Amino acid sequence: MSLQRTTDEVLQLASNYFKVPREQLGPDDDFFKKLGINSLQALDLLTRLEQHFHIELPDYELQGVSDFRTLAERIQSRL
């Protein structure tokens, strides 16, 4: 799977789960701000992404990650 496809799937899943139109989300957007979520909701999103991609993302790999592109890169590295 390409990084572009991984990024697209991350954006689509976030869009569906948080009921934000997909066209309002971009790879470089801060997901906390763009989705209007808190850290617990972000953790829920990460859990859903792990299930969707059948991976496990260690906490240390996610520290400081707040944009969709970097999140997709971390996921891609585990595929």
Predicted feature residues:
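Phosphopantetheine-dependent thiolation modules in NRPS/PKS and related acyl-activating systems
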Residues: S2-I37, L46, Q51-L79
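Two-component histidine kinase catalytic core, primarily the HATPase_c
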Residues: Q41
